[in-house]
């Protein structure tokens, strides 16, 4: 028999490492610095986010933000394009950028000893970009080819049309790339003016995650970004800029009978980033779920809609979405089907499942909450993901919710919350419809709208 008294005593000789916290500092010029320090990390990601994307453009310069993203790595007043590339290749660092409707983001992922240089390069790119006339002409051709490729992608076209019809007459309804005529006509002066108007210190954040400490990044930010000037009328981070868009119940259809599929998006007005029911809308999205017929376990998914679609072969795939902006959002579903004779059935069962959200069961809500937790929290598995999360939250809400707070907020959602939000957001509300491809079988707008005009549950 094992004698427990002879076993060595278990003595804890270390302290549990405290969870990393987000530290925030605002410089004198209004620029915000936020960090999550991981002292044992050997790399760090530093991100510079600008609270300006295609929404900050006019009809004349629509496409400027994306154009500048292309020009970012083509050289500065201090570094040629070749020097920029060599500087990062020699240190093993990674540099990238992307543009959305409300933000433009530049970030660098580097080893610990190369982080200060990465910050210097990011500052050089954002504040000293040369934007030569020859580089503008070269990138113009690249962007035109990119637009040609995007125009061949049904999902991109559908979602651009969805924004255009839902936010008619508002900058949020414009595309990120801009129309072809703008791409062909934007000048160096137009791009420099966009930088002057929007790349202001109070509209920028620097976030990091990994090896660099908060104090060190603040010093680097003061050194390389301290000379930037704020806007004439300063707004706090996360504050809406410009008029709130009016959601318009409407549709855009682009019928192409040569297409093998119908591609359809249906949406209601969703939640902004700051809306108290933001997470409830995400839970509702998870209840509706995503489905693709290539998924081997599709008959056993928790989504009721996926079961119906799979059993009756109504679609190739569907994807629910909850897209948020500073003062509005789009909540809906994207459907792809080659069963063109049953499009009406597909739309009917989709909206019927939207209606069922007012009577969602506790089991459905708890399962969706678990899926949402996994989606939001398990994705924070790298310094780049964490830096992006910090930057996005600061730009959209003005503060960062810790993973623990996110988990708590999701955990507090009940089936009553889902029923209330579904009733307020979906029932008898206008919808925006965007459809591309072989859509002869998609019935008229009023027929689709009437499916959610009466609550029978």
Curated annotation (Swiss-Prot):
Disulfide bonds: none annotated. The active site is at residue 69. The keyword Protease applies. GO terms for molecular function: metal ion binding; metalloendopeptidase activity. Binds 1 zinc ion per subunit. Zn(2+) binds at residues 66, 70, 146. It is an enzyme of class 3 (hydrolase). InterPro entries: Metalloenz_LuxS/M16, MPP/UQCRC_Complex, Pept_M16_N, Pept_M16_Zn_BS, Peptidase_M16_C. Binding to mas2 is required for catalytic activity. Coiled coil: none annotated. Its cofactor is Zn(2+). Pfam families: Peptidase_M16, Peptidase_M16_C. Transmembrane segments: none annotated. It catalyses: Release of N-terminal transit peptides from precursor proteins imported into the mitochondrion, typically with Arg in position P2. Keywords: Hydrolase, Metal-binding, Metalloprotease, Mitochondrion, Protease, Transit peptide, Zinc. One of its GO terms (cellular component) is mitochondrion. Its EC number is 3.4.24.64. PROSITE patterns: INSULINASE. It is found in: Mitochondrion matrix. It comes from the Eukaryota. GO terms for biological process: protein processing involved in protein targeting to mitochondrion. Belongs to the peptidase M16 family. Heterodimer of mas2 (alpha) and qcr1 (beta) subunits, forming the mitochondrial processing protease (MPP) in which mas2 is involved in substrate recognition and binding and qcr1 is the catalytic subunit. Catalytic subunit of the essential mitochondrial processing protease (MPP), which cleaves the mitochondrial sequence off newly imported precursors proteins. Preferentially, cleaves after an arginine at position P2. This is Probable mitochondrial-processing peptidase subunit beta.
């Amino acid at each position: 028999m094992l004698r427990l008294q002879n076993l060595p005593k278990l003595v804890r000789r270390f302290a549990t490492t405290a969870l990393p916290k987000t530290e925030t500092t605002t410089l004198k010029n209004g620029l915000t610095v936020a960090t999550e320090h991981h002292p044992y990390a050997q790399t760090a990601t530093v991100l510079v986010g600008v609270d300006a994307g295609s929404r900050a453009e006019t009809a004349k310069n629509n496409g400027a933000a994306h154009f500048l993203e292309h020009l970012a790595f083509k050289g500065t007043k201090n570094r040629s394009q070749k020097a920029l590339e060599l500087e990062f290749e020699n240190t093993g660092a990674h540099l990238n950028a992307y543009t959305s409707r409300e933000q433009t983001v530049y970030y660098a992922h580097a080893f610990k000893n190369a982080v200060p240089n990465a910050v210097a390069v990011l500052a050089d790119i954002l504040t000293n970009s040369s934007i030569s006339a020859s580089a503008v002409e070269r990138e113009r051709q690249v962007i035109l080819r990119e637009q040609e490729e995007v125009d061949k992608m049904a999902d991109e076209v559908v979602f651009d049309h969805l924004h255009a019809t839902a936010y008619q007459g508002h900058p949020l309804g414009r595309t990120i790339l801009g129309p072809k005529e703008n791409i062909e006509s934007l000048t160096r002066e137009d791009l420099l003016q966009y930088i002057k108007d929007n790349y202001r210190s109070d509209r920028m954040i620097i976030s990091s995650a990994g090896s660099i400490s908060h104090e060190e990044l603040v010093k680097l930010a003061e050194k390389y970004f301290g000379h930037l000037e704020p806007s004439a009328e300063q707004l706090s981070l996360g504050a809406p800029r410009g008029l709130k868009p009016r959601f318009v119940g409407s549709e855009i259809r682009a019928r192409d009978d040569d297409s093998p599929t119908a591609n359809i998006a249906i949406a209601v007005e969703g939640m902004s980033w700051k809306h108290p029911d933001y997470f409830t809308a995400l839970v509702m999205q998870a209840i509706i779920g995503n489905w693709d017929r290539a998924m081997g376990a599709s008959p056993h998914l928790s989504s009721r809609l996926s079961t119906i679609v799979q059993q009756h072969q109504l679609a190739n795939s569907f994807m629910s979405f909850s897209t948020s902006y500073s003062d509005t959002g789009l909540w809906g579903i994207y459907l792809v089907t080659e069963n063109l004779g049953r499009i009406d059935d597909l739309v009917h069962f989709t909206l019927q499942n939207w209606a069922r959200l007012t009577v969602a069961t506790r089991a459905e809500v708890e399962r969706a909450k678990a899926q949402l937790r996994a989606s939001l929290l398990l994705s924070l598995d790298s310094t780049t993901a964490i830096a992006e999360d910090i930057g996005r939250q600061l730009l959209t809400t003005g503060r960062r919710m810790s993973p623990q707070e996110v988990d708590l907020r999701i955990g507090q959602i009940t089936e009553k919350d889902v029923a209330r939000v579904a009733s307020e957001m979906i029932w008898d509300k206008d919808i925006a419809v965007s459809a591309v491809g072989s859509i002869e079988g998609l019935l008229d707008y009023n027929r689709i709208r009437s499916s959610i005009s009466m609550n029978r549950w």
